[in-house]
Regions:
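Short, conserved active-site loops that position catalytic residues or coordinate cofactors/metal ions
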Residues: 39-41
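Catalytic core of pol beta-like nucleotidyltransferases
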Residues: 1-23, 32-37, 49-100
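Conserved H-loop
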Residues: 29
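Short hydrophobic/aromatic beta-strand micro-patches
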Residues: 44-48
Length: 100
């Protein structure tokens, strides 16, 4: 299945809200309109610095289970400024969720 961006938001925003994610950004083939049935879903999530790796992995598991697809769920707190992933996020990123 190829989800629309709105479908991804609808499925994941309750998880992000419950788990206190600060911001989640979709990037990769889904934002470029190149996604196929075999495409994974690329998401970078910014979380509180105090969040444990176990809690972050729990969020990733919930996201994967909700979407039923392979997901590259990245810890955005450690993305290198102006590195490859940072540039991809700036170029192609679509905001899925932002805590108010």
């Amino acid at each position: 299945m190829v989800y629309t961006i709105e479908e991804i938001k609808h499925k994941l925003n309750p998880i992000f809200e419950e788990k206190n994610v600060i911001r989640a950004i979709l990037f990769g083939s889904y934002t470029k309109g190149e996604a196929t049935e075999k495409s994974d879903i690329d998401i970078a999530a910014l979380v509180d610095d105090e969040m444990s790796i176990l809690n972050f992995c729990d969020i990733a598991d919930k996201v994967i289970n909700e979407l039923g697809k392979n997901v590259d769920f990245l810890y955005a707190n450690d993305i290198i400024p102006n590195g490859k992933i940072d540039l991809a996020l700036k170029r192609d990123g679509v905001l899925l969720y932002e805590r108010i």
